[in-house]
Amino acid sequence: MMKEELGDEYVILLRTHHYIADALDVTGVEDFAYNLSKYDDITEIYLISDICITDYSSVFFYYANLKRPMLFYTYDIDKYRDVLRGFYIDMEKELPGPLVYSTKEVIDQIKHLDEMNQKYAQRYEVFYDKFCSIDDGNASQRAVEAVFK
């Protein structure tokens, strides 16, 4: 479904949790979906990605530094929140992008990326200020100044 809808403009780079990396099968869509699950440095994948689609992984905290769009594929949010682990933040109110519950919603958000960016711009800024603002390349300088003050 995604290849048919997005394949002319996008490719998908997949980086799963290492526990399930071997289970990912991209047979039949190798020219559209690339399994990078065993690629060591996820930050390099962030740099070449236009959009981050994640679930409950902490990767969005790091990806947010790039100020690029994010989608949160949360098809099982009720179970994850209420039964499995819970969350550190209020996902519905604080995430810097939409929660989507189906592949169709993922596709729709990607097709309407400009509208999504506008809708979540303010929330993204609040999130960035809260979680990313001191990650500005000057952390060592601040640490030295604090220690040798």
Where are these regions (language model features)?
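Short amphipathic alpha-helical segments and helix-helix/interface helices
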Residues: 1-3, 60, 144
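Acidic, amphipathic alpha-helical patches
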Residues: 42
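Short beta-strand/turn micro-motifs composed of small residues
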Residues: 14-16, 54, 74
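Catalytic donor nucleotide-activated moiety binding site of glycosyltransferases and closely related
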Residues: 1-36
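Catalytic binding pocket for nucleotide-activated donors in carbohydrate/polymer assembly enzymes
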Residues: 25-31, 58-131
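Acidic donor-binding loop of glycosyltransferase active sites
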Residues: 47-58
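C-terminal alpha-helical cap of glycosyltransferases
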Residues: 136-149
